[in-house]
Amino acid sequence: MEHMKSAEIRRRFLDFFAERDHRIYPSSSLIPHDDPTVLLTTAGVQQFIPYFLGQEKPPHPRAASVQKCFRTQDLEEVGDPSHLTFFEMLGNFSFGDYFKKEAIGWAWEFLTEGLGIPPERLWVTIFEGDENAPEDLEAKRFWMEVGVPEHKIFGLPKSENWWGPAGETGPCGPCSEIYYDYGEEFGPGDPLEDARYGPGGEEGDARFLEVWNLVFNQYEQLRDGSLRPLEQTGIDTGMGLERIAAVMQGARSVYETDLYAPVIERAREYTGVALGDGEETDRALRILADHARGMAFLIADGVRPGNQRREYVLRRIIRRATREAYGRFGLDAGRIASLAETVADYMGGFWGELREARDEIRRVVESEAARFIDIYHSGMRLLEAEISRLEGGRFPGEVAFTLHDTYGFPVEVTREVLAERGISLDEAGFRRAMERQRERAREALEGHERAVAAFRDREIRSRFVGYEREQAETRILAIEPVPDAEGELYLVLEENPFYATGGGQVADTGWISSEKGQLEVVDAIPAGDYQVLRARVERGRFEAGDEVVASINRVRRQQIEANHTATHILHWALRAVLGKEVVQAGSYVGPDRLRFDYRYSGRVTEEELARVQELCLLKITENQPVRYYTTTLEEARKLGAIMLFGEKYGELVRVVEVDGFSRELCGGTHVRGTAEIGAFKITSNRRHGADLYRIEVITGREALYYLTRAAETAERLAAELRLPGVEELPEAVSRLREELQQAREELRQQALKRGLEEVGSLVENAESIDGTKVVTGRVAAADVRDLRQISDDVRNRVGGPVAVVLAADLDGKAVLVANFHPEVSKRVKAGDVVREAAGILGGGGGGSPTMAQAGGGNLEAIPAALERVRQILSRELSGREA
């Protein structure tokens, strides 16, 4: 069988189905389009579901794709040879066109002829039937027609070979799976005698690998659970690229394929351990490889670390990778980010969004990993202290929740650390503590909703006068205290000048005053026919019916208005430079800055961005008039006014027009003339996914401050470098960068030389414990690579059974490297030694029996850590403490 790279498998798959009249679709984003109920894209079929459900008519009845997928259900299992989070799904689909005969025939043809897999290596499964649906004899017949012997076709129950429906009702049907047979030497039993040892059997995983699943949508499940035939059948297939690559590359694990090799090799360079060195380090390398791929693709598609939904998935895999990289191997945040960068480098050829987002991937991962390293330091100290006080083998859930809630230490890390120590977590106690906190949050939220509902029940109406006036003499219609917030009130005014949050624009703030006292308005919340103001009592008392003067913060409003009009001009300029395909995807308009998210499939060059900035400045300096008027929705359409996709509009709409070149439906507040915006500076334009960009801008005083500071900084740098002018800076910086790189290399070589010069002294002072030479000491080194080289030199100079453990200060961090002769590792493992000593340094570590690494932040503890190493080696090698 031909050894085949993953890129070639992808190409052959798409070519095969294109030749059979399939339209080739690009992968959809990992963020499901227009479906907030779905966390992440988990299958190739997701982008085609509207076609299967009959909600949309497909442009072509046949489709094929390579789809990015991310599944979280087995996240805790990642680290073994088979489980993944991110993967690529090869799939072909039929929407009422071909059915089982063609799907089975083409799958067989592609595997046996397109890839050259020997037919005798392939087994298949079909649905065995139950009380609701018969055995899939049709699929069995087609498999036998292509040449599969009957004894290699296994029937499996609905739990294994049935798909759908997605809810209680809807399309569903039997599946048929294709398995690759690694050979009888890998199986514990004969599948022909006992189906448990066959494909899909509970004991068959070691021998059989599922490579392709064919789903036959032929039934509709009704509310009573019964099935009826679909008028339009469908085909949905999925073949994991990682699995078929393992088959084509003769690998027993997906992690041994070219889809993982570059990132695993980079991890090996950083850690000094390779796959096969030991069970624990193998698990760590697989976690690093999988999570590096996952974080790179999630970030490229616009996900950022956070505490909700998919944002938390990204945060969790970065933190899980950091725990292994830093806690076990002592790698810093930069090295962790470099692993994700490596993924962008070697997978960016096919997945262009990775290449585009490479810098952003590094920035996000490095920032999140650095934050977690700080959390990990403090959290591990607290966790270790709690473990030392523990009586028994059960860790209190309340304590785990406090670590999580107060100190930000993730419960999954607590869970993993405890499992490694053989301690269980009181999960019920943790859930109770979590629920108590949620109940407190619910009560606060319900209090807010109760206040709004109470106003609504009174059938009050408030008139917004903020377009015309910045101050209003008005009356309080209703007032309620804010639950659990002493001195704060919710209130509704008869005439209200405060703009309530909406359309991306933040709410106005300001003051409400009367003879009785004064309130500071901190928020304005839209609530249908009125706006609810949230205010702090500065002095006095207020009640419904009071006559008051409401005044917005005028300076703040002007800054917001400038940014909102600038957003409209920016939108126009982007469409003028990049084309009409630019579509707004979201915005933030505040007093400090504006943020504009837009969809665009191409790459935005620096030249294009400069042109956008130039056009915006031109329109601002021309002092173009800004008009607002109300018209019908139909008339607004005729005028070409831009409308937000998915937004619901009434019959009458408000149009904001900037001198005829920009028209948008908008309910926000704006300047009267564009010159009021003042300065305008684009500060960033970052890609947040395959076709999503986020541009940020500052205007007015903020922009002037920014430009003034930038000019002052440039002048100071030019003076410091003794340059005639700031225009010489770019060339000077480039020259300095080259000199710095050269100096760093010279320092590294000098440190390595000093370290190697210390080898003689270390060898002379070697101890002997029960026939084993032991060398420990602190040496000079520039990085882990040099430290390992020095340890190799010591081991070679001593010769025979020797245990070498060296320490160094690497950029302010204490790092230990253990290098053991194989004979020594049979009695004591290098990974165990450094892991135990690492606690003294305030960190963690691990590795293989012969080579390991640890690190921590406490440099002053290096002598104590080395002394602990000597004690451990004395205990393990001679049976007594030193």
Curated annotation (Swiss-Prot):
Subcellular location: Cytoplasm
Gene Ontology molecular function terms on file: alanine-tRNA ligase activity; aminoacyl-tRNA deacylase activity; ATP binding; tRNA binding; zinc ion binding
Cofactor info, note text: Binds 1 zinc ion per subunit.
GO cellular component, one term: cytosol
The protein's Enzyme Commission number: 6.1.1.7
Biological process according to GO: alanyl-tRNA aminoacylation
Class of the enzyme per the UniProt entry, highest EC level: ligase
Reactions catalysed according to its record: tRNA(Ala) + L-alanine + ATP = L-alanyl-tRNA(Ala) + AMP + diphosphate
Gene3D superfamilies recorded: 2.40.30.130, 3.10.310.40, Bira Bifunctional Protein, Domain 2, Threonyl-trna Synthetase, Chain A, domain 2
HAMAP family: Ala_tRNA_synth_B
SMART domains xref list: tRNA_SAD
Cofactor(s) needed for function: Zn(2+)
Name of the protein in its database record: Alanine--tRNA ligase
Transmembrane regions listed in the UniProt entry: none
Family named by the database record: Belongs to the class-II aminoacyl-tRNA synthetase family.
CDD domains hit by this protein: AlaRS_core
Key words, A-Z: Aminoacyl-tRNA synthetase, ATP-binding, Cytoplasm, Ligase, Metal-binding, Nucleotide-binding, Protein biosynthesis, RNA-binding, tRNA-binding, Zinc
Domain notes per entry: Consists of three domains; the N-terminal catalytic domain, the editing domain and the C-terminal C-Ala domain. The editing domain removes incorrectly charged amino acids, while the C-Ala domain, along with tRNA(Ala), serves as a bridge to cooperatively bring together the editing and aminoacylation centers thus stimulating deacylation of misacylated tRNAs.
Main subcellular localisation: cytoplasm
Main function: Catalyzes the attachment of alanine to tRNA(Ala) in a two-step reaction: alanine is first activated by ATP to form Ala-AMP and then transferred to the acceptor end of tRNA(Ala). Also edits incorrectly charged Ser-tRNA(Ala) and Gly-tRNA(Ala) via its editing domain.
Residue sites binding Zn(2+) per the record: 564, 568, 666, 670
ATP-binding is among the record's keywords: yes
